[in-house]
Amino acid sequence: MIAVIPAIGEELIFRGVFQKIFFRLFRSGNLAIWVTAIIFSAVHLQFYGFVPRMILGLVFGYLFFWSGSLWPPVISHFVNNAVPVIWSYLEGGHKIIENSDIALWKQMIVLPLPVLASIVMLLYFRKKSIKDANSSLNQPVTSGL
């Protein structure tokens, strides 16, 4: 539940509400994504984690923008949250372990997994979005008569 509830709740709020509002306000997908990512990171209230969380917010924002669905950012957010929770459980039983308690070499192996999964989804949906845009440009225009 630690990984599920924030993934669904935060994505509904940040991508499903804020990003849509900013898109209507700015009429720019990129600006809406960046503003939402900055707010997403600021709300987490971690000074040293601001840039990494902003980058996560950008990834989640582009996943939503290019896929047209909340599910890809929810899944990516879930994986990002679940990996450290599972890791902590495996390392220390039922207690939550801080990243500083986990050997650096182990962090370097496991923690990039959610990032790689997100990048793969991001590239897939970007390619699909470009393909869909190109195919709609190549369709003949009918007069509707």
How would you label these PLM feature ranges?
Residues M1-F22, A117-K128:
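Transmembrane alpha-helical segments in integral membrane proteins
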Residues I8-I13, V17-F18, A42, Q46, ...:
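Active-site His/Glu-centered metal-binding helix of metallohydrolases
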Residues G9-V35, Y62-S69:
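Membrane-interface helix/loop boundary segments of multi-pass membrane proteins
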Residues N30-V35, F50-V51, V74-I75, P112:
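Hydrophobic alpha-helical transmembrane segments
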Residues F78-L145:
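C-terminal membrane module of polytopic membrane proteins
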